[in-house]
A protein has these predicted regions:
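Distinct, well-ordered alpha-helical segments
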Residues: 42, 112-113, 162-170, 187-202
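Glycoside hydrolase catalytic-domain groove-lining segments
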Residues: 79-95, 102, 183, 192-199, ...
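Boundary/entry segment of secreted carbohydrate-active catalytic domains
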Residues: 19-47
Length: 234
């Protein structure tokens, strides 16, 4: 399977080959809100020349001691729910903007999802089963929308590294219901340890690499700061 390298920032830039033509994808993350959207929300995105948008249905773990994932509840904002995702995506599709569905897990009090590692087998199973329900719900939504890309997870290093067999199985289950392109959004210091890149179509990196310790670095200093990271990625 051909693997493409993909960097996720607020602005997502993706290149891929199609019919021998190299097409550049200019993508942005569209933050969910309380309400439905219409042209007045979409037009600013179009003015950035974006032709892809990442839509982010959220889920929550309210107590990491009981790591059950909750999603699509009446406590969420509309844009964070499945119905909100469907409405947002259809509005963007009306103006020929393509869709990546990028589910996000949020831990109460802002804990880092990469550190999520249950301490008992019972809690691991609780996490796995609830994540399965969550990601398959949005894999089915991706199929319903004919979305071009589905991100199967975002910055979940502890989960991924401690339960590799689970992730191999869940990727297979996702592929049974969704036939589009798959990626995973690895944190910048995690990407070279992810064991399942070969099962996906894109290598996703949340590329917040440290580039400079200066308060006001020059463009050249930024470029120099990128060089070692670029070398590691390539």
């Amino acid at each position: 399977m051909k693997i493409y390298k993909l960097s996720f920032l607020l602005l997502i830039i993706l290149q891929f080959s199609c019919n021998s033509q190299v097409k550049k994808i200019n993508g942005l993350s569209f933050v969910a809100s309380r309400d439905s959207i219409d042209a007045k929300h979409i037009n600013p995105a179009l003015r950035t020349n974006s032709n892809y948008v990442a839509l982010m249905p959220y889920s929550f773990i309210r107590n990491i001691e009981i790591p059950k994932i909750e999603f699509n509840t009446n406590r969420e904002w509309f844009g964070e729910s499945k119905n909100g995702l469907l409405q947002y995506a259809k509005e963007f599709q009306k103006v020929d903007v393509k869709i990546m569905i990028k589910p996000h897990l949020w831990l109460r009090r802002g804990g880092f999802t990469g550190d999520l590692k249950p301490t008992t087998e019972e809690n691991w199973i609780l996490l796995e089963n609830s994540y399965r329900d969550y990601i398959l719900t949005y894999a089915k939504a991706a199929t319903e929308l004919n979305a071009e890309i589905l991100c199967i997870g975002t910055e979940l290093e502890g989960f991924v590294m401690n339960r590799p067999i689970y992730w191999q199985k869940i990727i297979k289950e996702i592929k049974e219901v969704y036939k589009g392109k798959l990626t995973y959004a690895a944190n910048w210091n995690e990407f070279n340890r992810i064991p399942f890149w070969g099962e996906l179509d894109f290598i996703g990196i949340d590329a917040y690499f440290p580039l400079s310790e200066k308060k006001s670095p020059t463009i050249q200093e930024f470029e120099n700061g990128w060089k070692p990271h670029k070398k590691d990625i390539i």
